[in-house]
From Swiss-Prot:
Its EC number is 7.6.2.-. Gene3D superfamilies: P-loop containing nucleotide triphosphate hydrolases (3.40.50.300). Probably part of a tripartite efflux system. The keyword DNA-binding does not apply. InterPro entries: AAA+_ATPase, ABC3_permease_C, ABC_transporter-like_ATP-bd, ABC_transporter-like_CS, MacB-like_ATP-bd, MacB_PCD, Macrolide_Exporter_MacB, P-loop_NTPase. Keywords: ATP-binding, Cell inner membrane, Cell membrane, Membrane, Nucleotide-binding, Translocase, Transmembrane, Transmembrane helix, Transport. This is Probable export ATP-binding/permease protein Pfl01_2215. One of its GO terms (molecular function) is ATP binding. SMART domains: AAA (SM00382).
Length: 651
């Protein structure tokens, strides 16, 4: 005789309840050959369901040996047992155990997904099986739209999806009326005749009478194992499908990933309000991260733009030791010769002397106090000052102490008002008449007063005709592009120290101010981002809580999936994907909301704008994904660790 398909030797199964242990199965010896139709009959509590669970690899024996087609199952892990369930067994349950949110076709397809059958083939096979069972007109119906008999036929089709070499039917007619029950038994007899091994688990002798072999179980022991003569003709198993291969397992992993996304989407849209509330924390966190990053970048660019407007690559040299030095007014060592020496340095683009004083300006009957600055023709280049109209004075103007002046926008407005062209007009600076040859463009930045009045005259004119001062208040040096600011500053200090013989001056490097602004901006952005991260963590905890609830609500679904061949890794992947999808949707909404805030921001604040970067968006997406993985792991792990028998028993 051929080797048994299923062989149990000395199988025992014990359970612990508190301090007590009781045996559900006691030293069971049983062999079942391929193509047999066996009925396991017994009263409630006899151990027949426990025996069926062990046969179907849903449970494990406490002691003894169980071989499937010669393969010992005692030391197999959960993944190997799941593969055996998938490749050998098809389950038909008393309560059908169909997933309520899936159509008949998709319920039938489920085992083939875990077996790695490509979507077109499994879809065609599911339709074929349902058509053979008389359900060709109900392919897209959900379980709630089917009668009990129709649901059981869907369950039978699902059991046959992967070939169903062994059909395990647990009270297949228990929840059906007489007519539907007879129809189900007819189908099972046809399957047996087609070569399937059919194992019926029932308490009804009439159902058991359809089998060719009846095994009676009581108190965990086999009381009898007798033949029941019937006219049967075993045929080849026409429903057999190829067993899993490495290539099919790769296809399976891809199919499972897609299925996980599909199931996640169905779960999300089935509980819209709960999903929205779950995502709320993620939305707030991502909106905060992206918006804060955009605001910080916009503020930084605004400040740096203002610094660059006054010359970010400039170094100013002053008398004294530092700002506020009371002795600086008495130090008169900065002289035009220093400017000439600085202009000789190869890394200096230009250097200009600066002297200044508040003097009275007069035009007709208008008198104003303004800051009068004596500078060289290079000053406007050093400071990056543009002309609104006219031209700056030239080197020849400086040499001949020309009585010319450049005024700023505010001075033009205060002296001449609207409708008067200031170019060519003569104003008094102190007692010196000067001709206006240029108007500097308005320079709005955080470092200049919007109300200050400034005029510029050639240094030689200021020193010789206005102030009578030969020493300088300061020197402004513009660094050539590409030269390191700190190195240039050190060399300027060395030159000045060499010329003066003592440190009677100090420098102010605006590049260091820019670096300080950037550092402060980064620190502030980091602080605000940490606050945003806290909201993300809170949102992640919310995701974990809801996912834990979801696992509890879908316990029976998890049990069904395990019964049809899902491995622990498949279940874990499905719930992880669901958590990640929730977080990614929340992240997408958060990013969109940030851009909407940026648009509103630009409508109300004209001076500067929020600057969104690809980096901040990618960071938001990565954060969403990581939160989904980190906070979805515990619920996913809990789902994968569920016992399939306990899960199937949940309502």
């Amino acid at each position: 005789m051929s080797e048994p398909l299923l062989q149990l030797t000395g199988i025992s199964r014990s359970f612990t309840a508190g301090d007590r242990e009781f045996l559900a199965l006691k030293n069971i010896d049983l062999t079942i050959h391929a193509g047999e139709m066996v009925a396991i009959i017994g009263a409630s509590g006899s151990g027949k369901s426990t025996l069926m669970n062990i046969l179907g690899c849903l449970d494990y024996a406490t002691a003894g040996s169980y071989r499937i087609n010669g393969r010992e199952t005692r030391d197999l892990d959960n993944q190997a047992l799941a593969e055996l369930r998938r490749d050998y067994f098809g389950f038909i349950f008393q309560r059908y155990h169909l997933l309520p949110h899936l159509s008949a076709v998709h319920n039938v397809e489920m085992p083939a997904i875990y077996a790695g059958t490509p979507e077109p083939q499994r879809h065609a096979r599911a339709r074929e099986l349902l058509a053979r069972l008389g359900l060709e007109g109900h392919l897209t119906h959900r379980p709630s739209q089917l009668s009990g008999g129709q649901q059981q036929r869907v369950s039978i089709a699902r059991a046959l999806m992967n070939g169903g070499e062994v059909i395990l039917a647990d009270e297949p007619t228990g929840a059906l009326d007489t007519t539907s029950g007879k129809e189900v038994m007819r189908i099972l007899l046809e399957l047996h005749a087609a070569g399937h091994t059919v194992i019926l688990v029932t308490h009804d002798p009439k159902v058991a009478a359809n089998a060719e072999r009846i095994i009676e179980v009581s108190d965990g022991e086999i009381l009898s194992d007798r033949r029941n003569e019937r006219d049967t003709a075993a045929l080849s198993n026409e429903d057999a499908v190829p067993k899993s291969t490495a290539a099919r397992r790769l296809v399976a992993s891809l199919g499972l990933f897609k299925e996980a996304f599909n199931m996640a989407w169905v779960a999300l849209i089935s509980h819209r309000m709960r999903t929205l509330l779950t995502m709320l924390g993620i939305v707030i966190g991502i909106t905060s991260v992206v918006s804060i990053s955009a605001i910080g970048e916009g503020a930084k660019r605004y400040v740096l733009k203002d610094i660059q407007a006054i010359g970010s690559n400039t170094i100013d040299i002053y008398s004294g030791t530092s700002f506020g030095d009371s002795r600086s007014a008495a130090i008169e060592t900065l002289v035009p010769a220093d400017v000439t020496a600085l202009n000789q340095l190869y890394y200096v683009d230009s250097a200009t002397p600066v002297v200044g004083r508040n003097l009275l300006l007069r035009y007709r009957n208008i008198d104003l106090d303004a800051q009068v600055n004596g500078v060289s023709d290079l000053y406007f280049q050093v400071r990056g000052i543009k002309m609104e109209s006219g031209i700056p004075f030239s080197e020849s103007d400086a040499r001949r102490q020309a009585q010319v002046v450049v005024i700023d926008h505010n001075t033009r407005h205060r002296l001449f008002g609207e409708g008067v062209d200031p170019l060519g007009q003569v104003i008094l600076i102190g007692n010196l008449p000067c001709t206006v040859i240029g108007v500097a463009a308005e320079n709005k930045n955080i470092f200049s007063s919007s109300k200050s009045l400034n005029v510029w005259v050639p240094y030689e004119t200021a020193a010789g005709r206005l102030l009578g001062q030969r020493y300088l208040d300061s020197i402004s040096v513009r660094i050539k592009d590409g030269q390191p600011s700190k190195v240039v500053e050190d060399n300027v200090n060395k030159l000045m120290l060499q010329r003066h013989g003592t440190k009677d001056f100090f420098t102010n490097n605006l590049d260091s101010v820019m670096q300080t602004v950037q550092k402060t901006s980064r620190s502030l952005a980091l602080l605000l981002s940490l606050i945003a991260v806290i909201s993300l963590v809170v949102g992640g905890i919310g995701v974990m809580n809801i996912m834990l609830v979801s696992v509890t609500e879908r316990t029976r679904e998890i049990g069904i999936r395990m019964a049809v061949g899902a491995r622990q890794s498949d279940i874990r992947q499905q719930f992880l994907v669901e958590a990640v999808m929730v977080c990614l949707l929340g992240g997408a909404i958060g990013i969109s909301l940030s851009y909407a805030i940026g648009h509103l921001f630009s409508l109300f604040i004209k001076e500067w704008e929020m600057v969104f970067s690809l980096t901040s968006v990618l960071t938001a997406v990565i954060c969403s994904t990581l939160i989904g993985i980190v906070f979805g792991f515990v619920p996913a792990r809990n789902a994968s660790r569920l016992d399939p028998i306990e899960a199937l028993a949940r309502d």
